[in-house]
Amino acid sequence: RLFKQYFAIDAYDVSYSRFDGTESKVFRREVFERDADAVAVLAYDVKTDEIALIEQFRIGALNDSDSPWLIEIVAGMIDGNERPEISAIRELKEEIGVSISEDKLLRICEEYATPGGASEKTTVFIANTDLSGLGNHGGLDVEGEDIRVFKAPLTEAYKQIGLGRIKNAVTILAIQYLLIEKEKVKQIFR
């Protein structure tokens, strides 16, 4: 382990079997490590065709030419031995104040955002939610969160991707998935 504070950096000396059957040379790579994997949840109201989005400060976007305040979907770390579904339900409550049961979750994929240098895997869900009582603020003070919560029509959120306003990869993935598979998702949530 080369470094450990809020995050960690580990170094690995690795080799692998190449596609041509030979063994690669041993090489060193540093990997940005998280103590746990993550979940991301697109809260979707089937009745209104709206989604819940959040806006929060992100240190990784500090030098972004527009703003370090990013528009995202609900996301967070998996605690201990929690199943991803339980983490998703907890994060929905913590970040946007919405409570759901596990049968309202649809797992759409698992993804590695930056596997060339980071180990974090995110399980992505769509949640069948009623957004009629959605508040405008969320997050946990103990986690340093100050989250603006808002609703957007699905098609308007998609337009914000093209305008460069939504820059978070897992958010883009979830919105695009829902647009492509909306009829299937609606059938599942009936």
Describe the role of every protein-language-model region:
Residues S99-I108:
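A short coil-to-beta-strand element that immediately follows conserved catalytic motifs
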Residues L2-T48:
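Acidic, metal-coordinating catalytic segment for phosphate/diphosphate chemistry
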Residues F32-E33, L42, E50-R90, Y112, ...:
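Conserved Nudix-box catalytic region and its N-terminal flanking loop in Nudix hydrolases
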Residues I9-A11, L53, V124-I126, V149-K151:
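Conserved hydrophobic/aromatic beta-strand scaffold that supports enzyme active sites
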